[in-house]
Amino acid sequence: MRSDTITQGLERTPHRALLKGTGLPQSEMGKPFIGIATSFTDLIPGHVGMRDLERFIEKGVHTGGGYSFFFGIPGVCDGISMGHKGMHYSLPTRELIADMVESVAEAHRLDGLVLLTNCDKITPGMLMAAARLDIPCIVVTAGPMMSGRGDAGRKYSFVTDTFEAMARYKAGVIDDAELARCEENACPGMGSCQGLFTANTMAILTETLGMSLPRCGTALAVSALKRRIAFASGERIVDLVRQNITPRSIMTREAFENAIRVDLALGGSSNTVLHLLAIAHEAGVELPLETFDILAKETPQLASMNPAGEHFMEDLDVAGGVAGVLKQLGDKIHDCPTLMGLSTKEIAASLKGVDEEVIHPLSNPVKKEGGIAVLFGNICPKGAVVKQSGVSDQMMKFTGTARCFDSEDKAMAAMMGGVVKGGDVVVIRYEGPKGGPGMREMLAPTAALMGLGLGDSVALITDGRFSGGTRGPCIGHIAPEAAAGGPIAFIEDGDTIELDIPARSLKVMVSDEVLAERRARWVAPEPKIKKGWLARYAKVVTSAHTGAITTAE
């Protein structure tokens, strides 16, 4: 075992002494050393319930014959960090998390890891670490929050009843009392936000990849089932160490294709494109951006999930969960191994039935194509991403007039001030991985568009990204980004922009010669942040089309 490096032999006397200083008995010294990487914090609802899950994981490890050690990993809530300086830090924490897990596991020669996670960037960061280390690992996602409840059985959801509610209030659609009800009811307790936002999408994809146990991706945070899954995961990691089953044997090209198909079938968050590309990079799997679009054209959307649809995570869980989606996709799914020991098709076959009002059959899809589309054109020669499952039919093709902003803050002020009108295309740039830095989510502007009633008359394009809670004609991940000299930097107010999602096209209607002339006189702006972690991050991060990974160069 890897831990023999610190427990065996005369030369390791000091190491054993230090371990015994933690209370480790001599009788446990030869057991598999299991690290439990916990992202517990009582600052955010998605992670506040993890103390209980830690206990169950620990019990499982010891029942399985291992010895566990806890170590902490930071967790950032995208909702709390949204709309201010804090959002610059969200995506970069993904890299910090991967590096921290790698550092602790390698420094202490741990034999295996249980990765306890939940919110947006923590789960992909943990998976990146697992793929990079390639030692036995299993992921436990802490689970989704229940929907909020109000008068007459009304259901509340965090994004639609807070961010969008602000704009509805500003427009006079709701009053003080209703706004207060939204605030009180939107987040009723522990768990990740209730709809198919980034955290829940990543939990589902983790299960689909085979890196967490069945039902882990959808079981509610408050459920007894989640605690049983935590226990079973702790027990299972010891078996994985003994059998030397490692993440790269699970996260194959075929497994990534399965994850993409499930993502497309559910209409998941566009952030998953960034994260799957980054995880695949760490796993040594070639996964071009175009793969998402190729699979989208042959994978129909089978569910209508909040925020763009009617169903919540609690509905998806009882309808069949991930296994139900796999079952409905049938032969479109590869038969891949999972950490459970069963293959994907065996897991799907074990499910007796599926609630087809929630997870439709292939013969009766919600939409003919999957939820994510990849666009190209003279604005985005290396690609852009749109969550087409959240776009109304009338906005799938749109031509409008550019209204350009060099930051999210300026765009938000213009929207709330009534400057943006129907027929505009809002261009938000210098918000990419380098330019932001940190590729902030544009949830506040997109929620403002919907709340102001402009979702069917205004499009938004950006080199930033969007929340999993975003809906409407919002195109993100434009690459190359403005700070890297991408063409989005050369768009001017008044330009005509043509969006054609069915044709996978996004263009500014000016000639190549005009764009070349604008490029020649373009001067890169000074970095927004010149010291600290974000300044270092901006120097080594790539554009969105490669997953916004960091490089050694």
Curated annotation (Swiss-Prot):
GO cellular component: cytosol
Residue numbers binding [2Fe-2S] cluster: 119, 193
Pathway annotation from the record: Amino-acid biosynthesis; L-isoleucine biosynthesis; L-isoleucine from 2-oxobutanoate: step 3/4; Amino-acid biosynthesis; L-valine biosynthesis; L-valine from pyruvate: step 3/4
One GO process term, biological-process aspect: L-valine biosynthetic process
Recorded catalytic activity of this chain's protein: (2R)-2,3-dihydroxy-3-methylbutanoate = 3-methyl-2-oxobutanoate + H2O; (2R,3R)-2,3-dihydroxy-3-methylpentanoate = (S)-3-methyl-2-oxopentanoate + H2O
PROSITE patterns (UniProt xref): ILVD_EDD_1, ILVD_EDD_2
EC assignment: 4.2.1.9
List of residues that carry N6-carboxylysine: 121
Catalytic EC class: lyase
Alphabetically ordered keywords of this record: 2Fe-2S, Amino-acid biosynthesis, Branched-chain amino acid biosynthesis, Iron, Iron-sulfur, Lyase, Magnesium, Metal-binding
Cofactor or coenzyme needed: [2Fe-2S] cluster; Mg(2+)
Details of cofactor binding: Binds 1 [2Fe-2S] cluster per subunit. This cluster acts as a Lewis acid cofactor.
Catalytic residue positions: 467 (proton acceptor)
An example molecular function term from Gene Ontology annotations: 2 iron, 2 sulfur cluster binding
Sites where the protein binds Mg(2+): 78, 120-121, 441
Matches recorded under Pfam families: ILV_EDD_C, ILVD_EDD_N
Matches recorded under InterPro entries: Dihydro-acid_dehy_C, DihydroxyA_deHydtase, DiOHA_6PGluconate_deHydtase_CS, ILV_EDD_C, ILV_EDD_N, IlvD/EDD_N
Functional description taken from the UniProt entry: Functions in the biosynthesis of branched-chain amino acids. Catalyzes the dehydration of (2R,3R)-2,3-dihydroxy-3-methylpentanoate (2,3-dihydroxy-3-methylvalerate) into 2-oxo-3-methylpentanoate (2-oxo-3-methylvalerate) and of (2R)-2,3-dihydroxy-3-methylbutanoate (2,3-dihydroxyisovalerate) into 2-oxo-3-methylbutanoate (2-oxoisovalerate), the penultimate precursor to L-isoleucine and L-valine, respectively.
Subunit structure as annotated in this protein's UniProt entry: Homodimer.
The family this protein is said to belong to: Belongs to the IlvD/Edd family.
Name of the protein in its database record: Dihydroxy-acid dehydratase
Organism: Geobacter sp. (strain M21)
Gene behind the chain: ilvD
